[in-house]
C-alpha cells in the first residue's frame, strides 16, 4: 500500500538536540492507494551550522519513493483536491558513498497521480527517532480503539462549552455558575441546556431538573447496589425489597406538609427530645419495661423511632433484632415528624447498626459451627525428649483425690474456639537402648530412643497420676491391678440397679440427632441475622432519603438580599458570573 502524506512548506528550527541530531517529521496519511506515490520519511538536519530561522532539509529516499532527481527530493503538496509538485527541499550532499539512486526500485514511476477524494485539512506531529533508522514510515492514523480516554462531559448550556471529566464537577458547575443564587442576583430558573426550555419556580426544582441532563446517580441502594438520581427514586425502589421480605408497603397517602397546623396529633406521640440521652451514651437506660411486649406486638416506623429507639444502642443483639423485625414497612412520604431531630437520630442509629452488623457478616458461618464440648487428645503425637530427671518423672501422692470422671467443658467467647490444652510429653529415662561401651550422640532435631523397659514399672497403681498432665489428654496409658473382669457383660447389666428409662436417657444423650438439631438451630439463627441485616439496610436508606428530601425542601429558604438602587434596578440585567480563562 502506498499513500499521500502532508508536509509543511516551512518549518523553523528553534532548538538543538545534542544527543539526537535529527527529528522525524511524521506525516498524516491522507489517501491509501495501491499505486506508488510520493511517500517516505523526512529528517531535519540540525547538525550543520545554520543561520537563525533558516530551513535546511534532508530527505531520505525509500524504495517506495518515485522521485529520482539527483540529490533532490520532491514532495507532492496537495491542496483543495489538486496535485501540484512543489519543491520543498534544497540540494543535499550524501554523507556516505551510498547513492540515493541505488535506494530506488522503480525509477520510471510518474510523480503525480489524480485522486479525487482528498481531504483539505491536514495534521502534523513531530516525533523523535534514532538517525540510523531505515524503516519506512508507518501509518500515523489514530486508532480510537486503543488508549481511549475517559468520557469527556461537555456543558451544553447556552454559550458554554467547558469540558469536565466527572459528572459531579459538571453538576457543581451548573448549579453554581449557571443556576446561581438569589443572594448573588444571578438566579436562573429557566433551563438553557441545549434545546431544553423547562421553567421552574424554585431553585431546588431547577437543580433537581439538571440531573436529567447530567449522568449523575449519587444515591445507591445498600441491598442491590443500584444507583439513582434522586432520593425519591430510591425510596420508590425500596418497595421492591420490602416485598421480597414479605412486607407490603402501605399505600401512598398524602399527609400535611412539615410544619403545618393540620398535623393530626393522634398519628404520633409528642416527645421532648431534649430529655432523651444521645445514642450510645454511657448514661443511656435500657429498655427493659418494653421487653415483654416487644416479641409479638408490631409497631409503626414513626412510633418506634420516636418512642423506643432512644432506649437502644446501635449494636446487634437478639432482642434488638427481634424488635426490628416487628417494625412495619415505612411510608414513602414524610408524616408524623414535627422537626428534623428524630429523622437525624434515625439516620445515625441505623447507619451505625448497619456498620456493626456488616463486621459480623464474614463470621456468620464460623459463629454457628457445631463445636463439641469435649476436646479429645490428638491422634498424631510427635514425642520429643526433654531433660527430665527420674525423680521428677512420676510423682505419687497419698493425699491425692480420686480421678475426676467429668470432662471439663470449654467456654467459647467472641465466637472463637478455646485453645487446646498443653501437651505434656512422656518422661524419659537416662538409660539409652545402645551398647554400654558406645557413647551415643544425638542431634538437636533428632528423635531420641524410648527408655528401656526396665526403667518403667509395668504395673502402675490406680491413682498414681502426673500432676502436670491433664486427665483428659493423657499421652500414655496407665494400668491398675484392681481391674474388673468383662467376661459376663449381660449378667452385670441385669444385676445392676439401672432402670430401662435411665438407659434410654443415656442413649439419647449420645444420639446424633442432637447435633443435627443444633445445626438446624444455628442455620435458622443465620437466616434471621441476614433478614435483620437486610431490613436494617432498608430502614437506613429510607432514613437517609427522608433526610435529604428535607434538605432539598429547606434549600430554597429566603436568603438576605441586598436592596439595589432604584436607578440601577430598572437597568439591571441578571447575567451569569464568569471567570477569566488562563491560556498557557
Curated annotation (Swiss-Prot):
One of its GO terms (biological process) is positive regulation of transcription by RNA polymerase II. It comes from the Eukaryota. This is pH-response transcription factor pacC/RIM101. Activated by C-terminal proteolytic cleavage by signaling protease (probably palB/RIM13) at neutral to alkaline ambient pH. PANTHER family: PH-RESPONSE TRANSCRIPTION FACTOR PACC/RIM101, PH-RESPONSE TRANSCRIPTION FACTOR PACC_RIM101. One of its GO terms (molecular function) is zinc ion binding. It comes from Candida glabrata (strain ATCC 2001 / BCRC 20586 / JCM 3761 / NBRC 0622 / NRRL Y-65 / CBS 138) (Yeast). Transcription factor that mediates regulation of both acid- and alkaline-expressed genes in response to ambient pH. At alkaline ambient pH, activates transcription of alkaline-expressed genes (including RIM101 itself) and represses transcription of acid-expressed genes. Residues 385-422 are annotated as: Disordered. PROSITE patterns: ZINC_FINGER_C2H2_1 (PS00028), ZINC_FINGER_C2H2_2 (PS50157). The keyword Secreted does not apply. It is found in: Cytoplasm; Nucleus. A zinc finger (C2H2-type) spans 153-178, 189-213, 219-241. Residues 389-410 have a biased composition (Low complexity). Belongs to the pacC/RIM101 family. Keywords: Activator, Cytoplasm, DNA-binding, Metal-binding, Nucleus, Repeat, Repressor, Transcription, Transcription regulation, Zinc, Zinc-finger. The keyword DNA-binding applies. GO terms for cellular component: cytoplasm; nucleus. SUPFAM superfamilies: beta-beta-alpha zinc fingers (SSF57667).
Amino acid at each position: 500500500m502506498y499513500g499521500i502524506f502532508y508536509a509543511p512548506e516551512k518549518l523553523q528550527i528553534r532548538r538543538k538536540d545534542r544527543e539526537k541530531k535529527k527529528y522525524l517529521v511524521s506525516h498524516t496519511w491522507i489517501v491509501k492507494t495501491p499505486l506508488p506515490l510520493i511517500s517516505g520519511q523526512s529528517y531535519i538536519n540540525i547538525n550543520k551550522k545554520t543561520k537563525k530561522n533558516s530551513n535546511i532539509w534532508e530527505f531520505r529516499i525509500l524504495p517506495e519513493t518515485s522521485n529520482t532527481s539527483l540529490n533532490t527530493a520532491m514532495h507532492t503538496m496537495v491542496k483543495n483536491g489538486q496535485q501540484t509538485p512543489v519543491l520543498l527541499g534544497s540540494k543535499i550532499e550524501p554523507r556516505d558513498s551510498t547513492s540515493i539512486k541505488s535506494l530506488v526500485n522503480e525509477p520510471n514511476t510518474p510523480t503525480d497521480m489524480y485522486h479525487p477524494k482528498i481531504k483539505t485539512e491536514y495534521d502534523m506531529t513531530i516525533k523523535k527517532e534514532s538517525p540510523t533508522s531505515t524503516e519506512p514510515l508507518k501509518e500515523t492514523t489514530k486508532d480510537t480503539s486503543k488508549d481511549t480516554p475517559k468520557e469527556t462531559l461537555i456543558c451544553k448550556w447556552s454559550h458554554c462549552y467547558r469540558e469536565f471529566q466527572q459528572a459531579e464537577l459538571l453538576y457543581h458547575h451548573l448549579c453554581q455558575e449557571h443556576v446561581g443564587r438569589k443572594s448573588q442576583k444571578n438566579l436562573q430558573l429557566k433551563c438553557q441546556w441545549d434545546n431544553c426550555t423547562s421553567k421552574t419556580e424554585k431553585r431546588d426544582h431547577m437543580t433537581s431538573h439538571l440531573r436529567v441532563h447530567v449522568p449523575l446517580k449519587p444515591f445507591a441502594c445498600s441491598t442491590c447496589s443500584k444507583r439513582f438520581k434522586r432520593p425519591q427514586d430510591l425510596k420508590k425502589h425500596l418497595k421492591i425489597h420490602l416485598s421480597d421480605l414479605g412486607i407490603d408497603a402501605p399505600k401512598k397517602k398524602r399527609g400535611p406538609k412539615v410544619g403545618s397546623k393540620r398535623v393530626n396529633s393522634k398519628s404520633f406521640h409528642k416527645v421532648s427530645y431534649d430529655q432523651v440521652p444521645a445514642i450510645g451514651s454511657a448514661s443511656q437506660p435500657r429498655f427493659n419495661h418494653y421487653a415483654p411486649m416487644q416479641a409479638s406486638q408490631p409497631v409503626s416506623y414513626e412510633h418506634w423511632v420516636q418512642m423506643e429507639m432512644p432506649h437502644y444502642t446501635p449494636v446487634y443483639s437478639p432482642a434488638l433484632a427481634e424488635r426490628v423485625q416487628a417494625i412495619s414497612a415505612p411510608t414513602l412520604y414524610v408524616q408524623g415528624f414535627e422537626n428534623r431531630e428524630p429523622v437525624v437520630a434515625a439516620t445515625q442509629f441505623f447507619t451505625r447498626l448497619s456498620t456493626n452488623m456488616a463486621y459480623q457478616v464474614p463470621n456468620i458461618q464460623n459463629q454457628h459451627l457445631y463445636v463439641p464440648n469435649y476436646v479429645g487428645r490428638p491422634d498424631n503425637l510427635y514425642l520429643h525428649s526433654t531433660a527430665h530427671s527420674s525423680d521428677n518423672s512420676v510423682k505419687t501422692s497419698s493425699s491425692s483425690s480420686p480421678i475426676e470422671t467429668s470432662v471439663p467443658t470449654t467456654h467459647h467467647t467472641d465466637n472463637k474456639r478455646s485453645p487446646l490444652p498443653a501437651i505434656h510429653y512422656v518422661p524419659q529415662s537416662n538409660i539409652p537402648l545402645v551398647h554400654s561401651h558406645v557413647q551415643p550422640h544425638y542431634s538437636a532435631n533428632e528423635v531420641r530412643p524410648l527408655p528401656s523397659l526396665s526403667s518403667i514399672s509395668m504395673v502402675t497403681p490406680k491413682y498414681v497420676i502426673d500432676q502436670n498432665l491433664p486427665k483428659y489428654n493423657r499421652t500414655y496409658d496407665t494400668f491398675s491391678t484392681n481391674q474388673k473382669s468383662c467376661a459376663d457383660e449381660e449378667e452385670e447389666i441385669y444385676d445392676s440397679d439401672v432402670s430401662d428409662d435411665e438407659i434410654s436417657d443415656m442413649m439419647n444423650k449420645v444420639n446424633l440427632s442432637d447435633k443435627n438439631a443444633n445445626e438446624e438451630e444455628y442455620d435458622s439463627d443465620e437466616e434471621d441475622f441476614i433478614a435483620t441485616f437486610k431490613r436494617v439496610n432498608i430502614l437506613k436508606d429510607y432514613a437517609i432519603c427522608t433526610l435529604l428530601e428535607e434538605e432539598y425542601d429547606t434549600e430554597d429558604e429566603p436568603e438576605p438580599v441586598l436592596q439595589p438602587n432604584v436607578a440601577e434596578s430598572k437597568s439591571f440585567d441578571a447575567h451569569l458570573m464568569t471567570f477569566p480563562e488562563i491560556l498557557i
